[in-house]
């Protein structure tokens, strides 16, 4: 159901849901209306929930008949998916995944591609749907397979209510999307290998909320170009954490609001680039809890491969109400290191309380960054900013209490066996229930 931002939003979300959104998000027509119009049950097209028979042809046939104005239904059960799916040119359509799609072949690119879809919804009606990637078959040997999902050129959409399990590579990529809502999702996989990003998103006007991630790389990451994102109630539970980047040439990111972030052995902010170009501006991170993050708060403009351009202009970043600790005080708890040719400015640290579980001091590191808080220098004139580098050692322990989530992992999941599909979480931030209630439908569209 589309969320209208001019409502009081009592039925949908907190009043401040529009913090960085520029308009309405979500499908224009609800899934029940689509199901009433036309329903395509994949078992009517030859699908068998035996975990062996390839369900791909049945899904493609159902999509062909219901991708305009209808609902494609995957009933409960386990289905083998041995065909890469390209679900394209959907118009006012819904895909209800109440069963499990288990990867059944060795593909090389994308297991499920949803492309050029308008007014579409990909969801689980019983909150038990899942895609099982069996990624351990690759990752235990240091190899990679295909990605689970890619949503490309999708508008007025929602994705919600299911689990993405043990991907052989990336999990969910949202490529050039707009007016979308992404929520009530669980990612669970091997937590010690990179190139396993959970959510990579770029586009315009997107609301991401109530997400839990366990993986070996980035948790919820904004890529360029992106504008008008609200990202809240995020639980990175053994993960790289929430990031911006990495950023190359032509960067254009603005009006991104992260709030209510809970990090267990993950980082809440890692903005990374190395001699790219373009701009990052108007970004907020607030209400953040970090436990054992390697780099809890980091802006690093010398990260990775040198792209060879003039540097990304970073401006107007706000970090507000942060609590927690890093893993080792040999790494700065606060690191804001900007390009000497394009210094950062208008950076604000407000009530940021970061300590360490390793020792009796923390380091702050700042370079070519201007604003207020920590080791930042103040700027009288942003038109002429000098270069500088400074490090501060802090020995005074901040006074704060940072709660823990009961589901925090303390050890990495095994990497040599299939994952059991867990139930959908009922909380993604301490003391908070999901903004949108988990669905418990019986049958297609809940009819």
Swiss-Prot record:
GO cellular component: extracellular region
Main location: secreted
Gene (UniProt): rhgC
Disulfide bonds: 40-66, 219-236, 338-344, 366-375
Signal peptide (UniProt feature, chain positions): 1-19
Organism for this UniProt entry: Aspergillus oryzae (strain ATCC 42149 / RIB 40)
TM helices/strands, residue ranges: none
Keyword Hydrolase: yes
The UniProt record lists the keyword Cell wall biogenesis/degradation: yes
Positions annotated as active site in the UniProt record: 217, 291
GO molecular-function term, one example from the UniProt record: rhamnogalacturonan alpha-L-rhamnopyranosyl-(1->4)-alpha-D-galactopyranosyluronide lyase activity
Similarity-based family: Belongs to the glycosyl hydrolase 28 family.
Residues with attached carbohydrate: 37, 65, 237, 252, 316
UniProt-recorded name of the protein: Probable rhamnogalacturonase C
Organism placement in taxonomy: Eukaryota, Fungi, Dikarya, Ascomycota, Pezizomycotina
Reported function: Pectinolytic enzymes consist of four classes of enzymes: pectine lyase, polygalacturonase, pectin methylesterase and rhamnogalacturonase. Hydrolyzes alpha-D-galacturonopyranosyl-(1,2)-alpha-L-rhamnopyranosyl linkages in the backbone of the hairy regions of pectins.
